[in-house]
Amino acid sequence: MSTSLPLADRLNRPIGVLRLSLTARCNLACPYCCPDVEEPPGLLTLEQQIRVIRVATRLGVQTLRLTGGEPLLSRRLLPLLEAVAQARRDRSDPMAGLQAVALTSNGVLLSEPMGRALRAAGLDRITISLDAAEGEAAARMAGLQGGAVAGERLVRQVQDGIAAAFAAGFDPSRGELKLNAVIQRGINDDQLLPLAALARQRGMELRLIEYMDVGNRNQWTLDQVLPAAQMVERINARWPLEPLGRPRGGTARRWRYGDGAGSIGVISSISEPFCGDCNRLRVTADGQAFTCLFSAEGTDLKPALASDLQLEQAMRQLWQRRQDRYSEERDPAAAASTHAEMAYLGG
């Protein structure tokens, strides 16, 4: 087996994060994401998923994030976590180099038993997605029928999921439990303060994400983007903030509350792109590798999954060819380009 040093792409960006989607299905229907009802054909097996993770860590990946769709819908989630945890304990295994294993979920299925099982299986961090803290807006952002009643039910379910994660030992003060929210101007930007208040109750970091032109189903337009700077201004006017900056390779520029009640982060891929140090490789549930969230098509890894060596060669060549910097080159005035869908890519 190869023990090569971590590689870099054509813009000298190392590989550092593997985002592995376990499913394209979701139990919500958020309009900006537009998930598929059925899985794509040819899903990776558990053994193939483990091989992808092992080879990625050999190439330099230090963080594994499991995504969807909704990953809690995948029956392979717990077995995969357990296999990764076992490998991390073996110093001879490349996966021993993983510094963090994380999960992104909408939290609806995150019961107390599931929270304990995830923790016991070796999960280090959970990020829960909720785009509104009030009923009508929550239903709208999740694509639910039933208006405010359905939205209020969803918010309660997600709050229960947050409580379950907290009870399982995921500590917000150590960055182990965070809240994500996609913000659209004129759609849910009135939820900034309610979401911040909800996160502050638990001392969680709230990560605010600019509405992005990922996929082709969401009818994205630039005027629906609320720039991150304006999000920060609104929250700072209510609860004063102190800047923390953005770590190299990170997606979020962070602020902490002056009163100590947690922090916020803003992911500003539209208004302040961070392509220059992006270190993420995305692999879909059916084995397509994408070197950019805004890619039109991926590279099928399945033909290379016969051995670690073949897969390493394929992934190394893919990363060495990488020169994506879509967000820095985005031209809103140009005709809309084609992108893979958000739910398929796993965010």
From Swiss-Prot:
Its cofactor is [4Fe-4S] cluster. S-adenosyl-L-methionine binds at Y32, G69, S129, M212. Pfam families: Mob_synth_C (PF06463), Radical_SAM (PF04055). InterPro entries: Aldolase_TIM (IPR013785), MoaA (IPR013483), MoaA_twitch (IPR010505), MoCo_biosynth_MoaA/MoaC (IPR050105), rSAM (IPR007197). Residues 10-242 form the Radical SAM core domain. Binds 2 [4Fe-4S] clusters. Binds 1 [4Fe-4S] cluster coordinated with 3 cysteines and an exchangeable S-adenosyl-L-methionine and 1 [4Fe-4S] cluster coordinated with 3 cysteines and the GTP-derived substrate. GTP binds at R19, R65, T104, K178, R280, L281, R282. GO terms for biological process: Mo-molybdopterin cofactor biosynthetic process. It catalyses: GTP + AH2 + S-adenosyl-L-methionine = (8S)-3',8-cyclo-7,8-dihydroguanosine 5'-triphosphate + 5'-deoxyadenosine + L-methionine + A + H(+). [4Fe-4S] cluster 1 binds at C26, C30, C33. Its EC number is 4.1.99.22. One of its GO terms (molecular function) is S-adenosyl-L-methionine binding. Transmembrane segments: none annotated. [4Fe-4S] cluster 2 binds at C275, C278, C292. It is an enzyme of class 4 (lyase). Pathway: Cofactor biosynthesis; molybdopterin biosynthesis. Keywords: 4Fe-4S, GTP-binding, Iron, Iron-sulfur, Lyase, Metal-binding, Molybdenum cofactor biosynthesis, Nucleotide-binding, S-adenosyl-L-methionine. Monomer and homodimer. Belongs to the radical SAM superfamily. MoaA family. Catalyzes the cyclization of GTP to (8S)-3',8-cyclo-7,8-dihydroguanosine 5'-triphosphate. This is GTP 3',8-cyclase. It comes from Synechococcus sp. (strain CC9605). The gene is moaA.
